[in-house]
C-alpha cells in the first residue's frame, strides 16, 4: 500500500493500536525547557517514578531567560525559580542540560537541530507548540501539554490519534529576495490560520526543495500558524549535508546505514493525500502581516484590506476588530506603515542564514531615528558563528543591539517586551493581541524585511533596496 511520508513515520512508531482507543506511539526524542516542565517533574516525584529514557531527553533554558545578561540576577523572581528548578530536576533525573552558561544553550528548536538531536524518521515532542520546526528533517514533531510531558518522561510513549494528510506544493522557483518566511506567510494567507486543522502537512515542490535547512525549518515552524498538527519535509541530500558530523548524528558505519534508511523517507508516487494545496512560487512577493493573526497577511506592495469588501460577516467583524487594535486604516499602503521597534530572532528566524540575510540590509547603513532594533541569535553556536563572520559588528555599527541567545521578544515572558502602542517589525511567528507586550502591535516579516524596516523607519520592498 502506498504511503505518505507522515504515514511511514507514524506506522513505524505505533506500539499499540487497540480498537476504540488512541494508538500508543513511541517517542525518540523529548526536548524540555524551563516553562512547561516543572509540574511534569513534580508528577514523577509524587508517583515515585523514574525517567524512562534520560538519554533521549534534552533540556535547555530559553523562554524567560535574559538576552542582556547570563546572570541569574538578571531574571525576574518567577523566571529564576523556573530556571533553578530545571537545573535541580535535570541533575536529579540525569538529563543533559544546556543551561544559560553552556556554550550551546539556545532556543530549543534551534539548539536541537544544530546538535544533531533532530534526525529524519524520528518522533520528537516538546512542551512547546513550535516543535513542528523539526519536521524540516523528515521527523514527526509536535508540541504537547504538561500532562503529556509527564507521560513521555515516565513511559517514552504517548497516546495520539492519527491525523489527516495534506500536501502543500510550492511549484517553480521564487524570484530574488523571496525567503522561506515569505513562502510560509503566503501559504497561511492562502489557506488561513485554520486551513491545516486536523492535518499533518507535507511541504514539497521545487521551491521547498531549493530551500536550505534553515529555510525549511522556518516553513515547518509555522505549520502551527495554519492550524496543522505538524509540518514535514522529506529528507534529501541537503538534509544529510546539514547533519553530517554534528554531535548527536550517526557516525562512521552507522552514518551510512542512516543514509540508506533516510532514502526511504519520502511519499510514494501513488500515495493519496486527504487534501492538496498548490502555490506558484513566482507569484510570491515579500509578505507581512497587517492584523492580529498570521492569516491577516498581504504582499509589501498591497494595502490594508477594507472590511466592507468582505462578504462573510464573521470575517468582516474580525477585520474590523484587528484594524481597531493595530490602529491602521483600510486602504493604507503597507509601505506607509511606520515602525518604532524591530525584533530579529525567535525559533522561526534566528539561525545563521537569517542573520546573514538581515546583515545584508544593515551593512553600511543605520537604524532610523526613533527606532530601537535588537538582534537575538537563536543559540550560542549561532552567536559564535555570526561573530566569526563579523555579523555582530555590522549590526552594532548600524545601531542594532546584539544580544545573547533566547526566545526574547517573541513572547512577553522575559525582559524583552514592547510597550503599549509600540509597532514592531518582527521575525517571530505570532502577531496576536498582546503577544509581545500589552497593547503592542506586531507585524510578521522576514529577517531581510525587518532589517530594511529598521533602517527606513517603515516597511519597504527589499527587492528595491539592494
UniProtKB/Swiss-Prot annotation:
GO terms for molecular function: 3-isopropylmalate dehydratase activity; 4 iron, 4 sulfur cluster binding; metal ion binding. Belongs to the aconitase/IPM isomerase family. LeuC type 1 subfamily. This is 3-isopropylmalate dehydratase large subunit. Binds 1 [4Fe-4S] cluster per subunit. Heterodimer of LeuC and LeuD. GO terms for biological process: L-leucine biosynthetic process. Keywords: 4Fe-4S, Amino-acid biosynthesis, Branched-chain amino acid biosynthesis, Iron, Iron-sulfur, Leucine biosynthesis, Lyase, Metal-binding. Its EC number is 4.2.1.33. It catalyses: (2R,3S)-3-isopropylmalate = (2S)-2-isopropylmalate. Its cofactor is [4Fe-4S] cluster. It comes from Shewanella woodyi (strain ATCC 51908 / MS32). Pathway: Amino-acid biosynthesis; L-leucine biosynthesis; L-leucine from 3-methyl-2-oxobutanoate: step 2/4. Catalyzes the isomerization between 2-isopropylmalate and 3-isopropylmalate, via the formation of 2-isopropylmaleate. [4Fe-4S] cluster binds at residues 347, 407, 410. It holds the Pfam family Aconitase.
Amino acid at each position: 500500500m502506498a504511503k505518505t511520508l507522515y504515514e511511514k513515520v507514524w506506522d513505524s512508531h505505533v506500539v499499540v493500536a487497540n480498537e476504540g482507543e488512541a494508538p500508543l506511539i513511541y517517542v525518540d526524542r523529548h526536548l524540555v525547557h524551563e516553562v512547561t516542565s516543572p509540574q511534569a517533574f513534580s508528577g514523577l516525584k509524587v508517583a515515585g517514578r523514574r525517567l524512562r529514557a534520560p538519554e533521549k531527553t534534552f533540556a535547555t533554558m530559553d523562554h524567560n531567560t535574559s538576552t542582556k545578561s547570563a546572570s541569574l540576577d538578571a531574571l525576574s523572581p518567577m523566571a529564576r525559580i523556573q530556571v533553578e528548578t530545571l537545573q535541580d530536576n535535570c541533575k536529579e533525573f540525569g538529563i543533559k542540560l544546556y543551561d544559560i552558561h553552556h556554550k550551546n544553550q539556545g532556543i530549543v528548536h534551534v539548539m536541537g537541530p544544530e546538535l544533531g538531536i533532530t534526525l529524519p524518521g524520528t518522533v520528537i515532542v516538546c512542551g512547546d507548540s513550535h516543535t513542528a520546526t523539526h519536521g524540516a528533517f523528515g521527523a514527526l514533531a509536535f508540541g504537547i501539554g504538561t500532562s503529556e510531558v509527564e507521560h513521555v518522561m515516565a513511559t517514552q510513549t504517548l497516546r495520539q490519534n492519527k491525523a489527516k494528510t495534506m500536501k502543500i506544493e510550492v511549484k517553480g522557483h521564487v524570484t530574488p529576495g523571496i525567503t522561506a518566511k515569505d513562502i510560509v506567510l503566503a501559504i497561511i494567507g492562502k489557506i488561513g490560520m485554520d486551513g491545516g486543522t486536523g492535518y499533518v502537512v507535507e511541504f514539497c515542490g521545487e521551491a521547498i526543495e531549493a530551500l536550505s535547512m534553515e529555510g525549511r525549518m522556518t516553513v515547518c515552524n509555522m505549520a502551527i500558524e495554519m492550524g496543522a498538527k505538524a509540518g514535514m519535509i522529506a529528507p534529501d541530500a541537503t538534509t544529510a549535508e546539514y547533519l553530517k558530523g554534528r554531535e548527536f548524528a550517526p557516525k562512521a558505519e552507522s552514518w551510512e546505514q542512516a543514509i540508506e534508511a533516510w532514502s526511504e523517507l519520502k511519499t510514494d508516487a501513488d500515495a493519496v493525500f486527504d487534501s492538496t494545496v498548490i502555490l506558484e512560487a513566482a507569484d510570491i512577493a515579500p509578505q507581512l502581516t497587517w492584523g492580529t493573526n498570521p492569516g491577516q497577511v498581504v504582499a509589501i506592495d498591497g494595502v490594508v484590506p477594507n472590511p466592507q469588501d468582505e462578504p462573510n460577516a464573521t470575517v468582516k467583524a474580525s477585520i474590523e476588530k484587528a484594524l481597531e487594535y493595530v490602529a491602521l486604516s483600510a486602504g493604507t499602503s503597507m509601505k506607509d506603515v511606520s515602525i518604532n521597534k524591530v525584533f530579529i530572532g525567535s525559533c522561526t528566524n534566528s539561525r545563521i542564514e537569517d542573520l546573514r540575510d538581515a546583515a545584508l540590509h544593515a551593512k553600511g547603513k543605520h537604524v532610523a531615528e526613533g527606532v530601537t532594533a535588537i538582534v537575538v541569535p537563536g543559540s550560542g553556536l549561532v552567536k559564535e558563528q555570526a561573530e566569526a563572520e563579523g555579523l555582530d559588528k555590522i549590526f552594532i555599527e548600524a545601531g542594532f543591539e546584539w544580544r545573547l541567545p533566547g526566545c526574547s521578544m517573541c513572547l512577553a515572558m522575559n525582559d524583552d517586551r514592547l510597550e503599549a502602542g509600540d509597532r514592531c517589525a518582527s521575525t517571530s511567528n505570532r502577531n496576536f493581541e498582546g503577544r509581545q507586550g500589552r497593547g503592542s502591535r506586531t507585524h510578521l516579516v522576514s529577517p531581510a524585511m525587518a532589517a530594511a524596516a529598521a533602517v527606513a523607519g517603515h516597511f519597504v520592498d527589499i527587492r528595491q533596496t539592494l
